[in-house]
């Protein structure tokens, strides 16, 4: 009797398929390795350095995560507070205040701003915030705040320089060369200083400085400057004479320079003319006090003389 022997056909096929898959995986690994090798060859550092960089990034990310959790739990604040207490107990707290550079302003204004820092731990001082607060004072152009261990807070002040006096309806105010108002002053303190007036003149201080710089010979002779109608200047000299300038920065500077030249030749300042008007192009008008009265008196005298001559002629005709 014939016997049929069955072979494991399916097992053979599975083994063949497994070997084929293994070859594909090995081929893919070889190709991937080749690609990675190619990339690594192009990098400016070795594979070991790359591993170190990756490890550093992982550790940094982990540290950031730990710090975030700590902040959310309030741990840094507690540590900072405890450190401040330790520093204060060791004598590192604000016990003295040293102020430098104050000549004109009221030094008490600075102490008022810093008073809340007394007995505070030196480690908890916000120097930038203190500086910003001091810079809000009108007289302070700039301030620097620093620690002098163990217990002194040092304030260095750069003061603004008074430049002129702003005349307001109810008071006189010192201003610097940029128009910043410093403090109210009495009239006797304003004596000898340039006086400014007019609506919006505080925003035109630097423009006025440039205008007066156009005629250096006249600049020290100007005692007052009025900003008229938000468009032009009237200058009053120490002699009491007034010069009306035209509108426009360049036009006004040119007119002032022309006036300076005429004054150098004809000595206009200190003369009989009370007011000079240079608003019209290429000409100047002058007003002499009492001149109109003199002209009117001369005219009346001429008319009276003519009337008397006419009466005399009429009387002589009647006699004839």
UniProtKB/Swiss-Prot annotation:
Transmembrane segments: 53-73
Signal peptide range: none
Topology of the protein relative to the lipid bilayer: Single-pass type II membrane protein
Gene that encodes it: ftsQ
GTP-binding keyword on record: no
Primary location class: membrane
Protein name per its UniProtKB record: Cell division protein FtsQ
Subcellular compartments: Cell inner membrane
Source organism of this protein record: Novosphingobium aromaticivorans (strain ATCC 700278 / DSM 12444 / CCUG 56034 / CIP 105152 / NBRC 16084 / F199)
Keyword annotations of the record: Cell cycle, Cell division, Cell inner membrane, Cell membrane, Membrane, Transmembrane, Transmembrane helix
Family designation: Belongs to the FtsQ/DivIB family. FtsQ subfamily.
Segments on the Periplasmic face: 74-320
Gene Ontology cellular component list: cell division site; plasma membrane
PROSITE patterns from the UniProt entry: POTRA (PS51779)
Topological domain ranges for the Cytoplasmic compartment: 1-52
Xref: Pfam families: FtsQ_DivIB_C (PF03799), POTRA_1 (PF08478)
Function, in words: Essential cell division protein.
Domain POTRA: 92-160
A Gene Ontology biological process term: cell septum assembly
Region (Disordered): 1-24, 296-320
Domain of life: Bacteria
